[in-house]
């Protein structure tokens, strides 16, 4: 049984949460997010908190309630504080620059890669080898970061590639003769 669903999500000042049938909308200073709630979960908004209750008789209702609680908590944090993900480019000649709403990546291929950023994600390049992605939707930020990392994942011998800022790359020893 999930214990995550038992903890309510507190609504901070400046954040408005509304429920219209099965659609939950969270509005805050940084933007607004909308999510359709699973039928196995009842959502109750009262006294500045959002509570999640499983529907009786539905298999895995507690699991769905816990998942819904985590997603709604991410929505509340996103519209109030926002999320950011940092990427680091490691390798000779690997660089990134911002061109309008796109990121121009040079990752050792014979051609430059241009990654178009979706709506709701902003990027910043403090240096040629660093990328900072910001936005209100945690899932979207993680998806964009994973797509950029997927162009050239870190390899285990020299550690070259695109990695998350907090990622530790396991290194292998080269073959000995």
From Swiss-Prot:
Residues 152-171 have a biased composition (Basic and acidic residues). GO terms for cellular component: cytosolic large ribosomal subunit. SUPFAM superfamilies: Ribosomal protein L6. One of its GO terms (molecular function) is structural constituent of ribosome. GO terms for biological process: cytoplasmic translation. The keyword 4Fe-4S does not apply. Residues 152-177 are annotated as: Disordered. Gene3D superfamilies: Ribosomal protein L6, alpha-beta domain. Keywords: Ribonucleoprotein, Ribosomal protein, RNA-binding, rRNA-binding. Belongs to the universal ribosomal protein uL6 family. This protein binds to the 23S rRNA, and is important in its secondary structure. It is located near the subunit interface in the base of the L7/L12 stalk, and near the tRNA binding site of the peptidyltransferase center. Part of the 50S ribosomal subunit. PANTHER family: 60S/50S RIBOSOMAL PROTEIN L6/L9, LARGE RIBOSOMAL SUBUNIT PROTEIN UL6M. This is Large ribosomal subunit protein uL6. It comes from Shewanella sp. (strain W3-18-1). The lineage of its organism: Bacteria, Pseudomonadati, Pseudomonadota, Gammaproteobacteria, Alteromonadales.
């Amino acid at each position: 049984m999930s214990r995550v669903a038992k903890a309510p999500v507190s609504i901070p000042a400046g954040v408005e949460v509304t429920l219209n049938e099965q659609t939950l909308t969270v509005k805050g200073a940084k933007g607004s997010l909308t999510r359709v709630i699973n039928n196995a979960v009842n959502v109750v908004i009262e006294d500045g908190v959002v509570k999640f209750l499983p529907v009786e008789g539905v298999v895995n209702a507690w699991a769905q309630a816990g998942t819904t609680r985590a997603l709604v908590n991410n929505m509340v944090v996103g519209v109030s504080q926002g999320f950011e993900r940092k990427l680091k480019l490691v390798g000779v000649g690997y660089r990134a620059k911002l061109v309008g709403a796109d990121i121009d990546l040079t990752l050792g291929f014979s051609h430059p890669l241009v990654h178009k950023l979706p709506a709701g994600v902003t990027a910043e390049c403090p240096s040629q080898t660093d990328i900072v992605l910001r936005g209100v939707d945690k899932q979207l930020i993680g998806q964009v970061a994973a797509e950029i990392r997927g162009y050239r994942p870190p390899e285990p011998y020299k550690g070259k590639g695109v990695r998350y800022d907090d990622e530790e790359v396991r290194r292998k020893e080269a073959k000995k003769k």
